[in-house]
Curated annotation (Swiss-Prot):
Any Pfam family hit: CinA_KH
Signal sequence segment: none
Entry similarity comment: Belongs to the CinA family.
Protein source organism: Streptococcus pneumoniae (strain ATCC BAA-255 / R6)
UniProt name for this protein: Putative competence-damage inducible protein
């Protein structure tokens, strides 16, 4: 089924409101296996809406119109659809009764002829009751095309879609998705590696999405059950993870988790809890962002001992007991400083892990290092590891955010190697 969404309302075209209904509808339709091919917005104009309906009827088998069902003169969706289909508007008894009750309880409200429009549906349509408003929706099929009219306010549209429309549209199959999350590899490189899978996809499908510092892959398939979907998605997932970078590194090494809400931080916090280990941090350029991210999760007192924000050389020396002359000799942006910060954070808090971040957030270079240069140290029983990452071409906020992601990834790898 090819679906098309037409949002009716001049206020959308002028930018007065954001068309969140289209996003909601597309998401919910995808969940039941209905593909949305087109989204369009049109003003409150009969001629332009008629033209758009003509186009939609030729290319889509499901046409959903949102908005324009109210009581004002510019609410003309149902009237225009009826004209396009050569049908009359008729009153829905249930909607009429709701309108009667509404005004009976509000004797001071003036009931004008325009109010009656809200109880009308196109002749032959199945009414879609409005649980939170007065304007009734409708669904009808003409010449192989299903037309649906829905109210514009999201508070009215969402329950109508969830409780009225979707049960009437559901077929034997649904869309099932799985999200793979990758860190340490860019979208362009990932897409190049997976070019054959992407170019030849039919079902299941995969779609890459770039986010700040990471990439996700959404795997989707239509199936009649979760078990059937898992079989198809497992095959595609293994095909993806078995691929290698040009340097011969498996994509499995970059895939850190699943799901829309998962993050490197959540993975690390849960694994620290599972292993019963603790962590402390010493931060310079990130100014406590790593620690604040840890503290976003409940129950972290069992794994987070504390930490230090040592922005200046003097505070690195005073708070972490690193000799100032050594810091001056090596520089605050250096492998040495990252190593000592991590080791001292671990030692002073008696934690299993000590993590450190020092570098150049920008906008100016520091000690000859360009913006985006970051040293991250991780101290543990087995010794201290320091990595250098270059996060160039980013804003100050992005440099700090991505640096913290690298720190969490370093801890994640250490936890997995134990």
């Amino acid at each position: 089924m090819k679906a098309e969404i037409i949002a009716v309302g001049t206020e959308i075209l002028t930018g007065q409101i954001v068309n969140t209904n289209a996003q909601f509808l597309s998401e919910k339709l995808a969940e039941i296996g209905v593909d949305v091919y087109f989204q369009t917005a049109v003003g409150d104009n009969e001629v332009r809406l008629l033209s758009l309906l003509e186009i939609a009827s030729q290319r889509s088998s499901l046409v959903i119109l949102t908005g324009g069902l109210g009581a004002t003169e510019d609410d003309l969706t149902k009237q225009t659809l009826a004209k396009f289909l050569g049908k009359a508007l008729v009153f829905d008894p249930q909607a009429q009764e709701k309108l009667d009750i509404f005004f009976a309880l509000r004797p001071d409200y003036a009931r004008t002829p325009n109010n009656e429009r809200q109880a009308q549906i196109v002749e032959g349509a199945i009414p879609l009751p409005n649980e939170t408003g007065l304007a009734v929706g409708g669904k009808l099929e003409v010449d192989g095309v299903t037309y649906v009219v829905l109210p514009g306010p999201p508070s009215e549209l969402k329950p109508m879609v969830l409780n009225q429309l979707l049960p009437k549209l559901m077929t034997g199959s649904k869309l099932y998705s799985r999200v793979l999350r990758f860190f340490g590899i860019g979208e362009s490189q990932l897409v190049t590696i997976l070019a054959d899978l992407i170019d030849n996809q039919i079902d299941p499908t995969l779609a890459p999405y770039a986010k700040t510092g990471e990439v996700t892959l959404r795997l989707s398939t239509k199936a009649s059950s979760q078990e059937e979907a898992n079989q198809a998605l497992d095959i595609l997932e293994n095909q993806i993870l078995d691929c290698q970078t040009f340097e011969g590194i498996s994509l499995r090494d970059f895939c850190y988790g699943y799901g829309e809400e998962t993050s490197l931080a959540s993975i690390v916090v849960e694994e620290l809890k599972r292993q019963g280990k603790t962590i402390a941090a010493a931060e310079s350029l990130t100014a406590g962002l790593f620690q604040a991210t840890v503290a976003n999760f409940s129950g972290v007192s069992s794994i987070f001992e504390g930490g230090f924000v040592t922005y200046s050389l003097e505070e690195k020396s005073r708070m972490l007991d690193i000799p100032a002359k050594n810091l001056e000799e090596h520089g605050v942006v250096s492998e040495f400083t990252a190593q000592k910060m991590a080791e001292q954070a671990r030692s002073k808090t008696q934690s299993d892990f000590g993590i450190s971040l020092t570098g150049v957030a920008g906008p100016d270079s520091l000690e000859g290092h360009p913006v985006g240069t970051v040293f991250i140290g991780l101290a543990q029983d087995q010794g201290t590891e320091v990595i250098k990452v270059n996060i160039g071409g980013r804003s100050r906020a992005d440099v700090r955010h991505i640096a913290v992601m690298h720190a969490f990834n370093l801890v994640r790898k250490a936890l997995l190697s134990d």
